[in-house]
Amino acid sequence: MSSILSRYPEAETPVHGYFYSMVELAVVRVFVQHQIFDAIADDGTSIEELATKTGMELNLLERLSNFLVASKVLSSPKPGFIGLPSETKMFQQRRAKLFYSHIFDAFMGSAVKWPQYLQNNGLAEPQKSNRSPFGLGAGYPDKSFYDVLEMMPERAQAFNSTMAIGLGDMPITGIYDFSWVAAHSGTDPERTLIVDVGGGKGQAIKAIVEETPSIPASACVLQDLPNVIKDVPEEEGILNQVQKVGSSFFDKQPTKGALVYYIRRVLNDWPDDECVTILKNIREACASDSRLLISENLLPDEPSVSLAAADLWMMNFAGKRRNVRMFNDLASRSGFEISSIAKDKTSNSAVIEMLPVQI
């Protein structure tokens, strides 16, 4: 707790420090939303001029600014003026503004509902995607994250805009060696080599084939919901050759006996029981020599602050970051066993290879 006290020297106790932190988070969100940071000149701007430029009432702006100056988020070059310290100038950048707004709205709105959520659902992590802190915080306690986004287009737009800037994106290639897949292409030309399950608009399957061009794109299948598949760009090259199938991973796997079933950044979004449903659907479609490749962030047994926070972030949506033990549990419940884990050298990304257990 010493860090919260050092952040706010006036804090008499850690509780005071946490309170000041809550105030700061909220005031910064208001400044971001109303472009207050953008209107502050490099050499400082008077409160009166800033109120005129932004349309905020002078009294309100002064009260909010007083706290940010006291907490060193803003500077005060002279009485009645405020300026931006170098570290705060990031809030003039679109990337930082989008990210901060998203994590504040999506995380804080859900986190404040944790006590009520746990009281309603028991002291356990989310068991169903349609019973999540996010849904409760948004006013739809029986809807999943994606259901809520469909009903709240403004939230969906903010979410999509943040995802589009690629914050913390996972590497696709350079982790797992797909060359063995290419070696199989000549043994059975009719066999599907890779099925990209829940593959969105094909970024992953395209990158995999680009990395290992001896894998015929025509022997690969891109699967996602029909409304996603119809928006896959029509372009010359790899994606034009890949087979496209509209389906849900919660339904029976339509492509049987593929050499590889590849699923990236999917299980992260779902609670255990729904992950088991997804994996069982794949298991039922496997041939005896099929392999399942799961590309996800792998949680270490003793995660850092950032990784533990990311896991709790996912909990808001009924998702979950998993460690090796947790993936082993999913495998055993779904008819698979882990055969290898390939880890990225510069991140926590990994490709977990599983084999179907012969029954």
UniProtKB/Swiss-Prot annotation:
- Residue positions binding S-adenosyl-L-methionine: 198-199, 224, 248-249, 264-265
Q: What class of enzyme is it?
A: transferase
Q: What is this protein called?
A: Methyltransferase fsa4
Free-text disruption phenotype from the record: Results in the loss of production of equisetin and fusarisetin A.
The answer to keyword Cell cycle applying to this record is no
Presence of the UniProt keyword Methyltransferase in the record: yes
The task this protein performs is described as: Methyltransferase; part of the gene cluster that mediates the biosynthesis of HIV-1 integrase inhibitor equisetin and of fusarisetin A, both trans-fused decalin-containing tetramic acids showing also antimicrobial activity. The PKS module of fsa1 together with the enoylreductase fsa3 catalyze the formation of the polyketide unit which is then conjugated to L-serine by the condensation domain of the fsa1 NRPS module. Activity of the Dieckmann cyclase domain (RED) results in release of the Dieckmann product intermediate.
Q: In which pathway does it act?
A: Mycotoxin biosynthesis
Please name the GO terms of the biological process aspect recorded for this protein, alphabetically: methylation; secondary metabolite biosynthetic process
Q: Which family does it belong to?
A: Belongs to the class I-like SAM-binding methyltransferase superfamily. Cation-independent O-methyltransferase family.
Question: What EC number(s) is this enzyme filed under?
Answer: 2.1.1.-
Lineage, top-rank taxon, reads Eukaryota
Q: Which UniProt keywords apply?
A: Methyltransferase, S-adenosyl-L-methionine, Transferase
This protein's gene is called fsa4
Concerning SUPFAM superfamilies, the annotation shows: S-adenosyl-L-methionine-dependent methyltransferases, Winged helix' DNA-binding domain
| Family matches, as PANTHER family | O-METHYLTRANSFERASE (AFU_ORTHOLOGUE AFUA_2G17820)-RELATED (PTHR43712:SF11), PUTATIVE (AFU_ORTHOLOGUE AFUA_4G14580)-RELATED (PTHR43712)
- Signal peptide range: none
Supply the InterPro entries for this chain: COMT-like, O_MeTrfase_dom, SAM-dependent_MTases_sf, WH-like_DNA-bd_sf, WH_DNA-bd_sf
* GO molecular function list: O-methyltransferase activity
